[in-house]
A protein has these predicted regions:
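Active-site rim elements
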Residues: 137-139, 185-192, 221-225, 251-254, ...
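Short beta-strand segments
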Residues: 86, 166-167, 214-215, 248-251
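Short glycine/proline- and charge-enriched loop/turn segments
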Residues: 105, 179-185, 287-290
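N-terminal glycine-/serine-/threonine-rich beta1-alpha1-beta2 phosphate-ribose binding loop
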Residues: 1-110, 119-132
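Non-transmembrane alpha-helical segments in soluble domains
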Residues: 29, 55, 73-76, 98-102, ...
Length: 350
């Protein structure tokens, strides 16, 4: 039985396993190694070259040499000492790995999005609810100090009633060395795999899921690039929430230099705020107002993982828990369905 399921001092070491040590997983690994009171005891990946690099990274720290596996089920079966499991694998594998890790009693940090289908999301929520451990999703922007302060300001009535939300993610294409990402059946397409971060901030702001969505998108520039690509390179979607509230979101992957950027804006009766910078402007007044936000020594990924360890120790419900992560993932799926089917799609259809 994982030690965290027994009475334990907050100073006791938390033993960590990381499943998936590719691009995102290796970054999570570097950050979890910096969290006090943590020991990485096991690593798992199908790619032995990546596994060797991750093993060398861990071995050079106070954690010492970790055990390595290419089969996550074998790892979970053999290593009864694992307290928490970090999952950073392709999205279509999240459900089976997370449920298995929860069932053996570990707490789970699963990278976003939760899954590629609404059915798998629901199964993960059910598993998290019945688990002895804690489930936290990798929606790490909830731990970014500026975004967190901005949303607290909105919730306190700082910008008045929320009237409109606007976001966009306009960037260059992702590296073409990750084949699964460009297969929409494996990644969920980029509205689910990437845009879910921003959609999560907006659902956190509103506190409700949208009633319906409609949109349009396709592949206009990166045609068959990389070969076999099925993920969109551009789309736009509008969500309608209760109380006549709308969210406008667009996502482009072929922006030239100077046009790229990411925005998360909330407009209210008293003014508007940019979540990422914690900067707002009062209506009918000139000049920006920056909210007082202390500088963070670490980025949001570290802060999210550090919070996860604290939550696992205390058996406390995370800020980015299974229910909130499910809503944000399914908001992305609602937009995806509306885009694919070129019609208005209601929440109840998911």
């Amino acid at each position: 039985m994982p030690a965290l399921l027994q009475a334990q001092s907050p100073n006791d070491t938390v033993r960590v396993a990381v499943i998936g040590v590719g691009n995102r997983g290796s970054y999570d690994l570097k950050n979890i190694l910096k969290v006090p009171g943590v020991k990485v005891v096991a690593l798992c990946d199908l790619d032995t070259e990546r596994l060797d690099k991750a093993k060398a990274l861990v071995s050079a720290t106070a954690s010492g040499e970790p055990a390595t596996y290419t089969d996550f089920r074998k790892m979970l079966d053999e290593r009864k000492d694992i307290d928490v499991t970090i999952i950073a694998t392709p999205v279509d594998t999240h459900k089976m790995i997370a449920i298995d890790a929860l069932e053996v009693g570990t707490s789970v940090y699963c990278e976003k999005p939760m899954a590629t289908t609404p059915q798998d999301v629901r199964l993960m929520v059910a598993a998290a609810k019945s688990a002895k451990g804690v489930f936290q999703a990798g929606f790490q922007l909830r731990h970014d100090p500026r975004r967190r302060r901005s949303i607290e300001f909105i919730h306190s009535g700082g910008i008045g009633d929320v009237l409109f939300l606007q976001g966009y993610r306009h960037t260059g294409d992702l590296p073409h060395d990750t084949p699964w990402y460009f297969d929409r059946t494996r990644s969920g397409d980029n509205i689910v795999e990437q845009a879910c971060h921003i959609l999560d901030l907006f659902t956190w702001t509103v506190g409700k899921h949208p009633l319906r969505a409609f949109g349009s998108g396709g592949i206009n520039f990166f045609k068959n690039d990389p070969p076999g690509r099925t993920t969109m390179d551009n789309y736009a979607v509008i969500y309608e929430f209760p109380d006549d509230l709308r969210l406008e979101f667009s996502h482009i992957y072929f922006d030239p230099p100077g046009f790229s950027g990411v925005k998360e804006r909330v407009f209210g009766a008293k003014g508007a705020i940019d979540l990422a910078t914690a900067t707002w402007m009062e209506r009918d007044k000139k000049g920006e107002i920056k909210l007082d936000v202390p500088d963070a020594a670490e980025d949001s990924t570290y802060l999210s993982l550090a919070a996860f360890i604290d939550n696992a120790r205390a058996h406390k419900t995370p800020l980015n828990n299974a229910e909130s992560a499910a809503m944000s993932t399914m908001v992305a799926m609602l937009g995806r369905k509306a885009i694919y089917e070129k019609r208005v799609v209601r929440w109840e259809e998911l």
